[in-house]
UniProtKB/Swiss-Prot annotation:
Biased composition (Low complexity): 529-538, 583-603
Binding of ATP, residues: 131-139, 154
One Gene Ontology CC term in the entry: old cell tip after activation of bipolar cell growth
Residues at the catalytic site: 266 (proton acceptor)
Domain of life from the UniProt record: Eukaryota
Modified residues (Phosphothreonine): 528
Family annotation (Gene3D superfamilies): Kinase associated domain 1, KA1, Transferase(Phosphotransferase) domain 1
Residues in Protein kinase domain copies: 125-395
InterPro entries given in the database record: KA1/Ssp2_C, KA1_dom, Kinase-like_dom_sf, Prot_kinase_dom, Protein_kinase_ATP_BS, Ser/Thr_kinase_AS
Pfam families: KA1, Pkinase
Protein name, UniProt field: Protein kinase kin1
EC number: 2.7.11.1
Gene name for this UniProt entry: kin1
Sites of Phosphoserine modification: 535-536
Length: 891
């Protein structure tokens, strides 16, 4: 359901009737906690002082800072009141908006009624092209209306309680589906709450969160370097020196998360992006949760290739040890170019992971092998802690010490607690503010906390205590295992600033965010106790920063029955979006990569091995729209220019489990291309694929013109905003642009690439653009890749005949069906039965790969390069296919 602007005035009678129609259920008394998310939010103190708009059939409310529907702009959706907030500065490095807003949602158009505009505006953000689609939702590129800055907006569909009730009453199968959707929404709320609190140089930063009656909109910073996966595609493997830089940054981010009682639980190559500066950014906290050292988490989730053995064995876990295993898999992939455990048969793959036997290539250094052998240990009690990993000799080689966690300086929390901070500690299932105060006071008053607070013990990342030898950590770890064979060493609380308690961690994070918003230095914000009540009243903000509260339950339970794990090879809990479809492979289609079916990080051919790689490779390309366009009275342009190359943003993995997309099925390529919203008047991709080579070779790329943003921009604010809108929404800005259906002898201008270390030898060439283009068309035809011409390259669709054949196993621990109806399974801080089937990253044989290939120009060197961008589909099939294309291109 697309977001549309509501321009219809609403009377008081309509408001009253609609509001009275909402169910009024107290959170503590409701057996169905999910149904109270919207009601509880509307009844919150910060919301009740504002007028309420009419509630549409799916429920509707709007928060402070947004004017009434009758006075909204007809083209720009919800408009912020001029007096509600200070203008956003041009550079967002200092101030950002962390509040969760509920802007006015659009009304549903009748069959005869058509919208005036296709522009979609959420707050101050103009939504543009879809650059990633998955089972969780989609990611769109967006521009800020005032500053023109680019952002990534993650859009997650939500369900209304009435719809959920209707499904639950239909059948037992529908009840399971409804329960799955409830759990999904609660995880989304938790992700939104976490994303707005975390602030680390190697974690993708969230700027805003909006909710409507049908969607969550999470606004993230724009990461313009592409996926780490594309880095691996170009290089095959990295030198240890180069891998060490990335690994230290990943370790720094994990250290920050773990110190704040957060476990990621879905760390993998697809969830690591690379910025233009060459630094990594970790994304996707959809499966993250808070952990407590004395409790156990019982949600078995993640991606199979990166999942720890205890998850496959359905064993409760604390949290950080799961991230350490995934961290080890990521390190292995970086230095070896493939995963350590792989098999075509699903049961055999499970057995390999549980056994944990790893083969190390001979070219790895002894230190690197030693580190991997400590991380990839099947027994979590014997596995290295993150502290040990960060102090390993391989990790600190050529550096002064272990990577810093960038955790700010903190002081012990003292009573009384700040009520403003307490009110913002929502979204984590802590309960109402009264309960949070009661529980937090109990923790602060405990003997353990007071004892550590008095001693002033602090083992910060830069302190002398942390700079000890690797062998000291090994000895201490082993001794503790002997003394406490049941609990690993990370279960001891020896630092009140290092994951002492989830309530403590979130209190710190909220306090630090508040200081940061006021202009403080976030790395030095806690020199005074953070809990003292301010002497002067806090100035009220003009927006609602209250997240929808999580359901009220008794938390901190860790002895419940473990949930089952799905036998499905994807996250079946995610319902496919209505605008995300796929089609079965054609019987005539042949898979040219079937020879290497399960190779997900295969080494490249011997020809590529002989080539020397340059420093690094990043992937950039124009985004591809995946949502179906609503009917519009306007005539569609003959083509849609992609946004600027700077718009290359959070990849498809940013919107959920990157390879767990359960898509529908199509009849053919035309439907697929329509669903990807690639409008063109030229011949269809299927026709071109079947056309004679002479015809295909005559197809040329479209002129890019001014749509890429490389031309001179007008100094007028009006013209500037108009250009931003045209660029974002794909409207043509150059009337003289050549139609895609035209074939000319002159090649179109090629997108220049300025990212550091973008390409390797295997992805660049001194060949002319025409030659590379002809080779691309030849290779795509040879590999049965259906393609359609877009600006600067091709939008491609590959229908594999079978990459992986999942087989059922009789093993007790083999991916059992999740028990959606059970209420006895919970994480220590997840009241939801947070049962998430493990994603094995192996889509069904009928799953399709949607991706883009661009011909780009490498500046200064007068070289041409090929850039890939995955839209949807299995990451590892994509990696194998991209490697095959590069091999056949013979650049």
């Amino acid at each position: 359901m697309e977001y549309r602007t509501n321009n219809v005035p609403v009377g008081n009678e309509t408001k009253s009737a609609a509001l009275n129609a909402l169910p009024k259920i107290k959170i503590s008394d409701s057996p169905n906690r999910h149904h109270n998310l919207v009601d509880a939010f509307m009844q919150s103190p910060s919301y009740s002082t504002q007028p309420k708009s009419a509630v549409e059939p799916l429920g509707l409310s709007f928060s402070p800072g947004y004017i009434s529907p009758s006075s909204q702009s007809p083209h720009h959706g919800p408009v912020r009141s001029p007096s509600s907030r200070k203008p956003l500065p041009a550079s967002p490095s200092r101030t950002r908006d962390h509040s969760l807003r509920v802007p006015v949602s659009g009304h549903s158009y009748s069959a005869d009624e058509k919208p005036r505009e296709r522009r979609k505006v959420i707050g101050n953000y103009v939504l543009g092209k879809t650059i990633g689609a998955g089972s969780m939702g989609k990611v769109k590129v967006a521009h800020h209306l005032k500053t023109g800055e680019q952002f990534a907006i993650k859009i997650v569909t939500r369900l209304h309680p009435d719809i959920t009730k209707a499904k639950a009453a239909a059948s037992a199968e529908a009840t399971k589906a409804a329960q799955s959707e409830k759990n999904k929404e609660i995880r989304t709320v938790r992700e939104a709450a976490l994303s707005t609190l975390l602030r680390h140089p190697y974690i993708c930063e969230a700027r805003d969160v909006y909710i409507t009656n049908s969607h969550y909109y999470m606004v993230f910073e724009f990461v313009d370097g592409g996926q780490m996966l594309d880095y691996i595609i170009s290089h095959g493997k990295l030198k240890e020196k180069q891998a060490r830089k990335f690994v230290r940054q990943i370790g720094s981010a994990l250290s920050y998360l773990h110190q704040n009682s957060v476990v990621h639980r879905d760390l993998k190559i697809e969830n690591i992006l690379i910025s233009k500066t060459g630094d990594i950014k970790i994304i996707d906290f959809g499966l993250s949760n808070l952990y407590r050292r004395q409790s156990r988490l019982r949600t078995f989730c993640g991606s199979l290739y990166f999942a720890a053995p205890e998850l496959l064995n359905a064993q409760p876990y604390i949290g950080p040890e799961v991230d350490v295993w995934s961290f080890g898999i990521v390190l292995y992939v970086l230095v070896c170019g493939k995963v350590p455990f792989d098999d075509q048969n699903m049961s055999a793959l499970h057995a390999k992971i549980k056994k944990g036997t790893v083969e190390y290539p001979s070219y790895l250094s002894s230190d690197c092998k030693g580190l991997l052998s400590r991380m990839l240990v099947t027994d979590p009690l014997k596995r290295a802690t993150l502290e040990e990993v960060l102090n390993h000799p391989w990790m600190i080689r050529n550096y002064e010490g272990p990577p810093a966690s960038f955790a700010p300086e903190r002081s012990p929390i003292t009573l009384p607690l700040d009520p403003e901070i307490i009110r913002e500690m929502n979204g984590f299932d802590f309960g109402p503010p009264e309960k949070i105060v009661r529980e937090l006071t109990k923790v602060i008053s405990s003997e353990a906390y007071q004892s550590l607070a008095k001693t002033g013990f602090y083992s910060g990342p830069n302190s002398a205590d942390k700079k000890k030898s690797f062998f000291e950590f090994r000895i201490r770890h082993a001794a503790h295992d002997i003394e406490n064979p049941i609990l690993p060493s990370l279960s001891m609380n020896t630092d009140i600033y290092d994951a002492f308690h989830p309530l403590i961690s979130i209190y710190y994070l909220v306090s630090e965010r508040r200081v940061y918003e006021k202009g403080g230095n976030w790395n030095r914000i806690a020199k005074t106790p953070v809990s003292s009540v301010p002497s002067s009243p806090v100035q009220p903000t003009s927006y609602n920063r209250t997240l929808p509260p999580m359901p009220e339950v008794v938390a901190y339970k860790g002895d419940e029955e473990s949930p089952r794990v799905s036998r499905n090879t994807s996250l079946a809990r995610r319902k496919p979006l209505p605008d995300t479809e796929s089609h079965s492979p054609s019987p005539s289609a042949t898979s040219s990569i079937k020879k290497n079916p399960s190779s997900i990080f295969r080494r490249f051919s011997s020809r590529r091995k002989q080539n020397k790689s340059s420093t690094s490779t990043l992937q950039i390309s124009a985004p591809l729209e995946t949502s179906q366009s609503p009917p519009t009275p306007r005539t569609k342009p003959s083509h849609k220019p992609p946004v600027s190359y700077k718009n290359k943003l959070v990849t498809q993995s940013a919107i959920g489990r990157s390879t767990s997309v359960r898509e529908g099925r199509y009849a053919g390529i035309s439907s697929q291309m329509d669903s990807l919203n690639m409008d063109s008047t030229g011949p269809s991709a299927s026709n071109m694929a079947n056309a004679p080579p002479s015809v295909r070779n005559n197809r040329v790329l479209n002129p890019r013109g001014a749509s890429l943003g490389h031309g001179r921009m007008s100094t007028s604010t009006t013209n500037r905003q108009k250009q931003i809108l045209n660029e974002t929404m794909g409207n043509p800005v150059d009337k003289n642009s050549t139609s895609p259906s035209k074939s000319t002898d002159k090649l179109d201008p090629i997108k220049p690439v300025f990212l550091k270390g973008l390409f390797s030898v295997s992805t660049t060439s001194t060949k002319s653009t025409e030659s590379i283009q002809r080779d691309l068309i030849r290779v795509m035809g040879m590999l049965d890749i259906e393609y359609k011409e877009i600006k600067g390259g091709y939008a491609c669709l590959y229908k594999p005949q079978g990459i992986r054949t999942p087989t059922k196993s009789t093993s007790v621990h083999t991916r059992r069906k999740p028990s959606y109806g059970s209420n006895s399974t919970t994480d220590s801080y997840g009241s939801v039965p947070d049962t998430v089937p493990l994603d094995d990253n192996g889509e069904s044989p009928a799953s399709n790969l949607a991706f883009e290939i661009y011909i780009v120009k490498v500046p200064i060197l007068s070289l041409r390069g090929v850039s890939f961008h995955r839209i949807s589909g299995n990451s590892w099939q994509y990696k194998t296919l991209a490697s095959r294309i590069l091999n056949e291109l013979k650049l």
